[in-house]
């Protein structure tokens, strides 16, 4: 009985693949399950912040506008979401505002430039990141008194600076790597998938991510009682599939598939079934007729040792490796000696 050819490597060398990091950073407490100072006026989700931890000369005027809420998005296993809401303060509407950075209350006027959200490095008011996600996904529910009111989501991947998110801009200008800016009307629970816009021509060294939610797209507008629920935020890194086929140290009728999965295969806010890596073999490249020879339930890289059916021994054949949750496939020819 003849053996299959030795090692087929494609895309890049397997040893290099193993050396690459599978660490895809998420914003801590992305599911809003952990909270600090519960049932007090200083209640905030862990790693997220609102007016009660703000800075600036007018921060003492600000009141609580975020709270833990027991209404959660459809299908979640979590118990809590974050509720942000608007208030009327001395006749001025203060929009609900939640950020993983820090709020600054530098002006008495809602639209004042000194009222902003910012990254405060070397503190709890920042989130470090080492790459640029492809998109931000999150579940939201927005209710406003005026149907013309729009909520807003902003997220900035930026360089090594105390980056400031401003109305209609950001500072420092040359520190932006990627941006999400999205406005939306009142809605019941909805999962949003928001792609990051590339700004690496300004800065290509990501260090932090600053993400914020507000009940109105314009400061000082909207009505007291407008509210947004936020749940299960998840950064998406588009997945890729690579692999090698190896029959060293295998029996003559076996082949070992080493597959490398990178990126987000099964986002926890999408309620997908478990991802499966499936290996099939066929005599034709179109796989009109094929036999499954391996399967594993996993989201991460690994190996599958497959038994080759007798009908394929001594013939040229094709092997397909595919995933289910984020459909990807690779087809390679195995040439028999």
Predicted regions, residues:
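Short, solvent-exposed loop/linker segments at the N-terminal edge
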Residues: 246-253, 270
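Aromatic/hydrophobic beta-strand junction motif of beta-rich domains
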Residues: 138-140, 255-267
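Beta-strand signatures of extracellular beta-sandwich domains
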Residues: 154-156, 276-280
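Edge beta-strands of extracellular beta-sandwich domains
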Residues: 326-337
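Aromatic (Trp/Tyr/Phe) and Gly/Pro-enriched flexible surface segments
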Residues: 20-137, 148-238
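Bacterial Sec-dependent N-terminal signal peptides
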Residues: 1-23, 243
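Short, aromatic- and glycine-rich surface loops/edge beta-strands on solvent-exposed regions
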Residues: 207-215, 314-325
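Proline-enriched interdomain boundary motifs that mark the N-terminal boundary
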Residues: 239-245
């Amino acid at each position: 009985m003849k053996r299959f050819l030795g090692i087929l490597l494609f895309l890049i060398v397997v040893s290099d693949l193993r050396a690459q990091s599978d660490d895809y950073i998420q914003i801590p407490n992305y599911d809003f399950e952990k909270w600090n100072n519960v049932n007090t006026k200083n209640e905030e989700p862990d790693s997220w912040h609102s007016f009660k931890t703000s800075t600036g000369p007018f921060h003492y005027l600000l009141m609580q506008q975020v709270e833990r809420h027991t209404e959660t998005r459809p299908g979640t296993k979590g118990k809590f979401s974050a509720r942000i809401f608007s208030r009327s303060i001395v006749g001025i509407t203060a929009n609900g505002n939640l950020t993983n950075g820090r709020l600054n209350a530098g002006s008495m006027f809602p639209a004042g430039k000194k009222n902003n959200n910012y990254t405060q490095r070397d503190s709890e008011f920042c989130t470090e990141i080492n790459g640029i996600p492809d998109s931000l996904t999150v579940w939201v529910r927005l209710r406003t008194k005026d149907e013309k009111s729009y909520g807003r989501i902003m997220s900035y991947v930026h360089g090594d600076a105390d980056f400031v998110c401003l109305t209609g801009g950001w500072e420092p200008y040359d520190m932006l790597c990627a941006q999400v800016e999205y406005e939306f009307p009142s809605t019941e629970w909805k999962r949003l998938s928001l792609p990051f816009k590339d700004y690496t021509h300004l800065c290509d060294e990501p260090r932090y991510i600053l993400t914020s939610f507000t009940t109105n797209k314009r400061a000082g507008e909207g009505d007291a009682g407008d509210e947004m629920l936020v749940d299960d935020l998840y950064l998406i890194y588009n997945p890729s599939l690579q692999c090698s086929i190896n029959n060293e140290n295998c029996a003559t009728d076996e082949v070992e598939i080493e597959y490398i999965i990178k990126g987000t295969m099964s986002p926890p806010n999408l309620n997908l079934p478990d991802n499966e890596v499936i290996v099939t073999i066929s005599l034709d490249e179109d796989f009109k007729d094929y036999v499954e020879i391996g399967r594993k339930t996993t989201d991460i890289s690994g190996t599958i040792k497959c038994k080759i059916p007798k009908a394929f021994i001594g013939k040229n054949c094709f092997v397909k490796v595919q995933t289910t949750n984020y459909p990807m496939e690779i087809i390679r020819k195995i040439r028999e000696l």
